[in-house]
Amino acid sequence: MSIKSDRWIRRAAEAGMIEPFEAGQVRTANGGRIVSYGTSSYGYDVRCADEFKIFTNINSTIVDPKQFDEKSFVDFKGDVCIIPPNSFALARTVEYFRIPRSVLTICLGKSTYARCGIIVNVTPLEPEWEGHVTLEFSNTTPLPAKIYAGEGCAQMLFLESDEVCETSYRDRGGKYQGQRGVTLPRT
């Protein structure tokens, strides 16, 4: 497997892999600095949309991935999301992805957030998966933490195999195929 360059990412985006797409790096908006997004040397920095689900413990339930209670989250829409101390929030990317059959995509958090104790987690985007990426932001600090909508939050790395997979995510009817918006756990 080899990592794909900015040139490859631009060509793949022209074929519909990433929508909307930014061909370069955006570092400013409205005259001020932002957390960067867009194409980098060997990756693509995605933006966080303005839809959030903030984890709350008001119902004092047990977190069970097989029977997840939607009431464990408070829905929020806005330019800035405040994550409570030692808690987390779900969000989604602005970008919609269509991953080629020969590609596996790995997501890593941006250092701007990591250096503040905010960790971004996303599982790999498998071959022929498509949808908005659901992002998990963990606030590992004892203080409230801000996430900025419309700005960079994570970087996607594209790895292309020297052999096309026998069965893709689409072929096996993956449960998150075509997801839109913030998607909760499914079994």
From Swiss-Prot:
EC number(s) stated in the UniProt entry for this protein: 3.5.4.13
Residues at the catalytic site: E136
Pathway: Pyrimidine metabolism; dUMP biosynthesis; dUMP from dCTP (dUTP route): step 1/2
Enzyme class: hydrolase
Sorted UniProt keywords: Hydrolase, Nucleotide metabolism, Nucleotide-binding
Keyword field contains Hydrolase: yes
Catalysed reaction equations from the record: dCTP + H2O + H(+) = dUTP + NH4(+)
GO biological process, one term: dUTP biosynthetic process
GO molecular function: dCTP deaminase activity; nucleotide binding
Function: Catalyzes the deamination of dCTP to dUTP.
Record-stated family: Belongs to the dCTP deaminase family.
UniProt-recorded name of the protein: dCTP deaminase
Organism: Bordetella petrii (strain ATCC BAA-461 / DSM 12804 / CCUG 43448)
